[in-house]
Amino acid sequence: MASLEERLTEMLAPSVEDLGYELVGVEYIRAGKHSTLRVYIDQDEGILVDDCAAVSRQVSAIMDVEDPITNEYSLEVSSPGMNRPLFKAEHYQIFAGEEVKIQLRMPIQNRRRWKGVIVSAEDEIICLNIEGREERFSLSNIQKANIVPKFDN
């Protein structure tokens, strides 16, 4: 069965794309009685506040009709930002050579948090170079992944 985030992505992507944006991904963060639905969008020209507002109105209308989340939540629409989240294998392919932090659903070698450079992403397997060793992770076991921002001095 698909996760809530996967179902929301499938439900929202066509409308977001019709507005001219890429739906990068969706995060649903549970926090007691009040949760947050975070929708990340992008386009070649970058994202402005007006873009976020337009997508927010569209997503809000869809959520009101479909009602996939029964408890209270806040809707946030934003660009991926500097510490861009990675959701799909294609994202890892695009950002090959970049440093990434990942958090796993199930630990590997008693660790849930890993940091390394993206080597490849093939057949739903993400390969990272971690301190000179290549480690492989199933995309389905990656709960969260973000690019580590580079700051030039």
From Swiss-Prot:
Predominant subcellular localization, coarse grouping: cytoplasm
GO annotation (BP), single: ribosomal small subunit assembly
Compartment annotation: Cytoplasm
SUPFAM superfamilies linked: YhbC-like, C-terminal domain, YhbC-like, N-terminal domain
Keywords assigned: Cytoplasm, Ribosome biogenesis
InterPro entries registered for this protein in UniProt: Ribosome_maturation_RimP, RimP_C, RimP_C_sf, RimP_N, RimP_N_sf
The protein, known as: Ribosome maturation factor RimP
